[in-house]
Curated annotation (Swiss-Prot):
SUPFAM superfamilies: Urease, gamma-subunit. Heterotrimer of UreA (gamma), UreB (beta) and UreC (alpha) subunits. Three heterotrimers associate to form the active enzyme. GO terms for molecular function: nickel cation binding; urease activity. It is found in: Cytoplasm. Pathway: Nitrogen metabolism; urea degradation; CO(2) and NH(3) from urea (urease route): step 1/1. It is an enzyme of class 3 (hydrolase). InterPro entries: Urease_gamma (IPR012010), Urease_gamma/gamma-beta_su (IPR002026), Urease_gamma_sf (IPR036463), Urease_subunit (IPR050069). This is Urease subunit gamma. Keywords: Cytoplasm, Hydrolase. It catalyses: urea + 2 H2O + H(+) = hydrogencarbonate + 2 NH4(+).
Length: 100
């Protein structure tokens, strides 16, 4: 199987996001890489599902709360940017202050 660098990145994000989801379901708080992977995966899947950039930017602030991440993470993750493939092409999605 031959994968492009972008496809490899998406698989890595998926693996880390899956781990993050499992840890959340066990009541554990997410660290920095898990938090970024979780948010990035939500954007990638939302784009795949046909959501718009503005929808994802708005919804992105509701996916995680401060109680779900380790202390200091909300301050470290003040913005998440990820390129996602939409029906009309690749676009950069930026979520400002994603953890409330």
């Amino acid at each position: 199987m031959h994968l492009s660098p972008q496809e490899k990145d998406k698989l890595l994000i998926f693996s880390a996001a899956l781990l993050a989801e499992r840890r959340l379901s066990r009541g554990l708080k997410l660290n920095y890489p898990e938090t970024v992977a979780f948010l990035s995966f939500q954007v990638l899947e939302g784009a795949r599902d046909g959501k718009s950039v503005s929808q994802l930017m708005s919804e992105g602030t509701t996916w995680l709360s401060k109680s779900q991440v380790m202390e200091g993470i909300p301050e470290m993750v003040d913005e998440v940017q990820i390129e996602a493939v939409f029906p009309d092409g690749t676009k950069l999605v930026t979520i400002h202050n994603p953890i409330n």
